[in-house]
């Protein structure tokens, strides 16, 4: 939310020697509207007070340093020729070494006014005291009620700058939207190094909405440092310092650019439009602490209550107060000019925090002794007295419309009781009509003058809020912290009579997200604190060297062979850093767990907790909980690498895992040794009653007679040796049937391109090439395109496919099949449907030969290679097109023509003739990647004539050698080519559509 904090600059007026008709009757102090992030230096201010009282007079005041050549300009007065405006009277005065300026109208640039009562545009020319420097601005207003508007007024404050002749042709724009008025206002500044003329003045065009100029559009301020010192240091304004400021020279690297963004004003009627972005040129040789001092002096900030903090954006880093902007700012080469972002924040000072803490202690003592009700009444009376004194000391600067009785009654409907006097005095003094928008994390907006003040129970979270998403700078997100008691309000549980929750919700604004008590996480509210166990980490001292190598290889994601070549000292340092990172991660997790316990304890502290504090605690709880879950997901301890199997000796690769469990003989060895079927899955070694490892009794028998005698256990008893080792064979077989369940069916053989290769690389592992995500599909169940991404991402496989050239053909059927398989893969992996083809797009280009890949990357490139071999062509799509294609679910035998048209439109293909789908693209060098018609539906007579013609042209030795199996083994493209007529051998046209068969 936003709080409107008001400031004003007061100037003591002095009498002049001008005539009485030019002297104003009443003087209203000029004011300005600085942005939320103040620029670095402000020098000369153009303070314009435009008061349209009954549409008669327009007044302008220009405060500037005294100049000798002021008399060379001629005073002029112009009159309006339309509407109710009768005269334009320029007047000027002298305010403590400040001169005035002439305001004259450019009658040649006035556009015709069709209906002056409903709207109009007037252009003026404002001449400054600098020679050859001119400022022209135009303004327009729109009235919604027509000629009946008799009295309305508004005020506009503009920041102006001092411009030297070397800076020319600087254009800027400013916008002002009056509060609760059907009135629009705009200003346009044009700076040039030549005297302004009424005939050649042109208004610059607005930049393109997508250009860089439009992004940084707004008033530009050129502020030299020497003149800034002269204006800000009023006590040191001497003729010598003035001459020094005017004669100061600046190099190209003596100034930098700061970009400032004005956030939107938030009122009880909702947020207004966002303000402009300001571009400021300032001295690069200045220090950060000097910048803060100038801003405090310029804004007249009372440091006893509020302190100013500067935060750099994504381009400016304020590390030290004594740092120079030139040293801490770095340039960006990809932009046309150097721009830096700056953010100003107003936070409670240390003395203000001490007062708030002292007041909280008094409340706690009064609550303990049962005198809390009397303390509340005393605090309300004392606060009302302080508010009355502070309001009487501030002069009233409201305009006639704001001080009208109707507006006063309207604002009384949403008035709230005042907050703590100390904080409100710091925020509201000195008061001026124009607000400064400061981002502060509170649920109440404090608008202009007559607006509602903040309630006491809404004061607790006076903390600086992170910048909004619409801001031009990117500030770092603060780490989740528990709300401290030092920044809470003085009376949290105070409920003022006469106020209601509904009124407070109106004052909060439309951007406040309310969270009910049921939305709070478990552990907050009145529930007891939740037990959050902390994790302890114990590192072993004597870690094997092999475990260290595995830990470093897993942490750095490098092969073990490469890690083994490292020096032992480097290996020890990396392993030590891994251990330190694990300790820090566990330490951070324990701190977060302690914060959760503090949040739970604070939520159960008082039963009458306000909704604002509930909302703040819920957000903090969720933020801390998410960070703990993130740490748990990323936590990898060095002890995990110690549980891995031992490494092979130096220079040898790790052996692949066996195809069968330990102790189980393969079927071929069982058949060679003549093992009966009931013992083929028995282990070669068994554990006896004493815990020792014994060989299988069947394997210990030397000849076939003894084996047959053991099998017939009903008549022949086993020998003493077998009895001592293990009991009956039947019991052993029964136990093995219980302990070793039937083995699952072996995986299907891999694709023909990988026959014998994957089994050599990973024998016994499940084959990821045969992807079967959905077994319910009975049609077209030949998955030969997409390889499934395996879950074992740590395994590595070399890419053993040589490079190849992609064909220019397009197979529509295979493309549809590939899209359906990618859709099934997306469903099985629960991926985003709007990105289900990313697995296809990321597979191009192919890796080089023998490149080491993970299982997931290997399957991704393998799927893309299979698609290219099957003539699958899918262009790069947006996420919306991918989602539409995902929801289409087109099949090769689809009968809906609209689906086919939608599919061809998404794939950016030309529709075939007569809506005959699907079609296959024939080889063509003229047009690649577009499906065309290759055949038409033929009648039975045409087919018989075609077969008769083919038999007559074929030699007798060939006969009918083409069978259905050969036709099925050929690719769809070859089949289509074989069945086409000889006419298809003609040269293709530019549309790549071969002529069709003609009936005989």
From Swiss-Prot:
Gene Ontology biological process: epigenetic regulation of gene expression
Region (RNA-binding): 633-720
Main location: nucleus
Localization (cell): Nucleus
Low complexity: compositionally biased ranges: 390-404, 489-502, 960-992
Provenance organism: Caenorhabditis elegans
Lineage, highest ranks first: Eukaryota, Metazoa, Ecdysozoa, Nematoda, Chromadorea
Name by which UniProt lists this protein: Sop-2-related protein 1
Ranges of compositional bias, category Basic and acidic residues: 406-415
Gene Ontology CC annotation, any one: nuclear speck
GO function terms (MF aspect): RNA binding
Region (Disordered): 355-374, 379-422, 466-509, 948-1000
Disulfide-bonded cysteines: none
Originating gene: sor-1
């Amino acid at each position: 939310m936003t709080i409107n904090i008001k400031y004003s600059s007061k100037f003591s007026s002095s009498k002049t020697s001008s005539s009485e008709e030019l002297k104003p009757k009443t003087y209203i102090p000029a004011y300005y509207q600085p942005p939320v992030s103040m620029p670095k230096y402000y020098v000369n201010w153009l303070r314009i007070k435009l008061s349209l009282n009954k549409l008669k007079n327009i007044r302008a005041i220009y405060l500037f340093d005294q100049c000798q050549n002021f008399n060379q300009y001629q005073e002029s007065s112009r009159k309006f020729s339309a509407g109710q405006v009768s005269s334009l009277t320029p007047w000027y005065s002298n305010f403590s070494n400040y001169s005035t300026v002439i305001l004259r109208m450019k009658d040649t640039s006035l556009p015709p006014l069709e209906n002056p009562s409903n709207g109009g545009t007037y252009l003026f020319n404002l001449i400054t005291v600098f020679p050859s420097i001119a400022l022209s601005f135009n303004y327009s207003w729109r009235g919604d009620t027509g000629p009946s508007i008799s009295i309305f007024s508004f005020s506009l404050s503009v920041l102006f700058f001092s411009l030297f002749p070397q800076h020319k042709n600087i254009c800027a724009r400013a916008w002002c939207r009056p509060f609760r008025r059907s009135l629009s206002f705009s200003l346009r500044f044009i700076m040039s190094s030549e005297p302004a003329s009424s005939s050649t003045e042109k208004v610059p065009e607005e930049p393109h909405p997508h250009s860089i100029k439009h992004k940084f559009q707004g008033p530009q301020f050129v502020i030299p440092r020497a003149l800034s010192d002269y204006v800000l240091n009023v006590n040191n304004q001497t003729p010598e310092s003035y001459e020094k400021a005017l004669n100061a020279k600046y190099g190209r690297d003596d100034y930098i650019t700061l970009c400032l963004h004005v956030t939107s004003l938030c009122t009880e009627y909702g947020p207004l439009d966002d303000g402009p972005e300001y571009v400021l040129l300032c001295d690069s040789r200045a220090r950060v602490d000097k910048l803060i001092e100038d801003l405090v002096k310029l804004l007249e900030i009372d440091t006893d209550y509020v302190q100013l903090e500067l935060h750099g954006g994504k381009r400016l880093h304020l590390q030290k107060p004594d740092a120079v902007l030139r040293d801490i700012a770095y340039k960006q080469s990809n932009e046309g000019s150097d721009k830096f972002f700056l953010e100003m924040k107003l936070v409670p000072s240390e003395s203000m925090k001490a007062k708030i803490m002292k007041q909280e202690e008094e409340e706690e003592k009064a609550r303990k002794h049962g005198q809390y009700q009397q303390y509340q009444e005393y605090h309300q009376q004392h606060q009302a007295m302080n508010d009355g004194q502070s309001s009487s000391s501030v002069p009233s600067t409201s305009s006639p419309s704001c001080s009208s009785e109707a507006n006063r009654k309207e604002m009384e409907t949403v008035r709230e009781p005042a907050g703590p006097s100390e904080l409100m005095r710091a925020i509201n003094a000195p008061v001026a009509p124009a607000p400064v928008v400061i981002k502060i994390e509170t649920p109440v907006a404090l608008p202009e003058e007559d607006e509602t003040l903040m309630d006491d129970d809404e004061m607790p979270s006076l903390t600086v809020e992170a910048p909004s998403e619409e801001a031009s700078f990117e500030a770092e997100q603060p780490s989740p912290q528990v709300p401290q008691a030092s920044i809470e309000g003085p009376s949290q549980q105070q409920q003022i009579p006469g106020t209601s929750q509904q009124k407070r919700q109106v004052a909060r604004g439309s951007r406040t997200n309310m969270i009910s008590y049921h939305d709070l996480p478990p552990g907050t509210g009145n529930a007891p604190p939740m037990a959050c166990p902390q994790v302890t980490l114990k590192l072993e001292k004597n870690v094997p060297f092999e475990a260290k190598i595995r830990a470093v290889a897993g942490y750095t994601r490098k092969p073990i062979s490469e890690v083994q070549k490292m020096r032992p000292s480097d290996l020890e340092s990396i392993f030590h850093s891994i251990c330190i990172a694990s300790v820090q991660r566990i330490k951070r997790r324990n701190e977060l767990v302690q914060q959760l316990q503090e949040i739970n304890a604070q939520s159960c502290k008082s039963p009458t907790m306000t909704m604002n504090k509930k909302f703040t605690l819920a957000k903090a709880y969720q933020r801390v909980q998410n960070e703990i879950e993130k740490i748990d997901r990323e936590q990898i301890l060095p002890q995990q690498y110690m549980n891995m199997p031992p490494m092979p000796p130096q220079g040898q690769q790790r052996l692949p895992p066996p195809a069968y469990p330990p102790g189980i003989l393969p079927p071929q060895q069982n058949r060679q040794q003549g093992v009966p079927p009931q013992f083929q899955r028995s282990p070669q070694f068994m554990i006896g009653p004493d815990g020792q490892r014994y060989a299988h009794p069947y394997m210990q028998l030397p000849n076939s007679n003894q084996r047959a005698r053991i099998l017939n256990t009903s008549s022949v008893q086993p020998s003493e040796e077998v009895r001592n080792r293990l009991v009956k064979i039947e019991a052993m077989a029964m136990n093995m049937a219980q302990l070793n369940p039937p083995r699952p069916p072996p995986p299907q053989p891999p694709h023909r391109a990988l026959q014998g290769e994957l089994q050599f690389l990973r024998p016994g592992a499940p084959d990821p090439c045969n992807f079967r995500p959905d077994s319910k599909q009975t049609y077209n169940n030949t998955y030969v395109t997409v390889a499934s991404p395996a879950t074992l991402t740590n395994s590595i496989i070399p890419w053993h496919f040589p490079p190849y050239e992609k064909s220019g053909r397009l197979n529509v059927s295979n493309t549809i099949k590939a899209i359906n398989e990618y859709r099934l893969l997306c469903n099985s992996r629960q991926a985003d449907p709007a990105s289900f083809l990313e697995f296809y797009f990321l597979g191009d280009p192919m890796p080089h030969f023998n490149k080491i890949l993970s299982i997931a990357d290997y399957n991704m490139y393998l799927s893309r290679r299979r698609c290219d071999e099957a003539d699958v062509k899918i262009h790069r799509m947006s996420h919306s097109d991918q989602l539409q294609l995902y929801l289409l679910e087109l099949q090769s035998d689809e009968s809906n023509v609209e689906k086919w048209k939608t599919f061809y439109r998404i794939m950016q293909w030309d529709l075939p003739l007569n809506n005959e789908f699907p079609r296959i693209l024939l080889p063509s060098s003229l047009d690649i990647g577009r499906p065309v018609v290759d055949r038409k539906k033929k009648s039975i007579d045409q087919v018989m004539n075609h077969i008769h013609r083919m038999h007559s042209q074929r030699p007798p030795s060939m006969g009918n050698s083409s069978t259905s199996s050969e036709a099925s083994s050929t690719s769809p493209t070859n089949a289509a080519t074989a069945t086409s007529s000889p006419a298809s051998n003609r040269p293709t046209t530019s549309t790549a559509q071969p002529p069709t068969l003609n009936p005989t």
